[in-house]
């Protein structure tokens, strides 16, 4: 079994991780991985049971089964598009010379899916290049100015202002406004 290092997962699976639950004679290994590593592992058939992004689960729907419990859906918890420059946006890049660089926390993450959905024109017109990076390295890369934009998840959602970064858009709020459903 493989789960993410997300606090939601480690809390939900605490009983299993710390062997507080009777396994009824079953024995299995548990791997804690970044969400992109989990998605890649599922594409490579490495796991029998694993957490996946909803984006990856949709792509893999012909060969995987989504369990009826354990999913995280919610309001007000989506990824944030951040920049180290105030007032910057991939949409502004449409009228600017050159190409910007946007970091996403993995190709088949929900965060990357939302960026592609809402900023597809900037990607299509080659005004921003998408690169994938470990979620915990995105904000440091923005601060170092090695990228123009970053789609941040987990604790970055709450600490970006303290890091001197600027909010371009709350992608989760936009999803909720445009669809009326919780963010997967």
Identify the meaning behind each predicted range.
Residues 65-66, 128-129, 166-170:
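Short secondary-structure junctions
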Residues 133-184:
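Pocket-lining segment of extracytoplasmic ligand-binding domains
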Residues 1-19, 77-149, 155:
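Bilobed "Venus flytrap"/periplasmic-binding protein-like clamshell domains
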Residues 29-33, 129-133, 168:
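General small-molecule cofactor/ligand-binding pocket signal
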Residues 23, 59, 74, 160, ...:
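A generic structural signal for short, non-catalytic loop/turn and secondary-structure boundary residues
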Residues 1-72, 88-95, 101:
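N-terminal hydrophobic or amphipathic helices and topogenic motifs
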């Amino acid at each position: 079994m493989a789960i993410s290092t997300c606090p939601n997962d480690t809390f939900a699976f605490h009983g299993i991780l710390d062997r507080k639950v009777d396994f009824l004679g079953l024995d299995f290994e548990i791997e804690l991985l970044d969400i992109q590593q989990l998605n890649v592992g599922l594409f490579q058939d490495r796991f029998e049971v694993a957490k996946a992004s909803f984006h990856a689960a949709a792509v893999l729907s012909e060969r995987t089964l989504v369990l009826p419990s354990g999913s995280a859906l919610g309001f007000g918890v989506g990824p944030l598009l951040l920049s180290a420059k105030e007032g910057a946006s991939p949409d502004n890049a449409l009228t600017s010379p050159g190409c910007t660089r946007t970091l996403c926390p993995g190709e088949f993450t929900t965060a990357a899916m939302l960026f592609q959905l809402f900023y597809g024109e900037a990607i299509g017109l080659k005004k921003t290049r998408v690169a994938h990076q470990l979620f915990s390295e995105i904000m440091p890369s923005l601060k170092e100015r090695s990228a123009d934009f970053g789609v941040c998840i987990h604790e970055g959602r709450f600490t970006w202002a303290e890091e001197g970064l600027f909010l371009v858009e709350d992608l989760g709020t936009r999803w909720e406004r445009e669809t009326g459903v919780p963010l997967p």
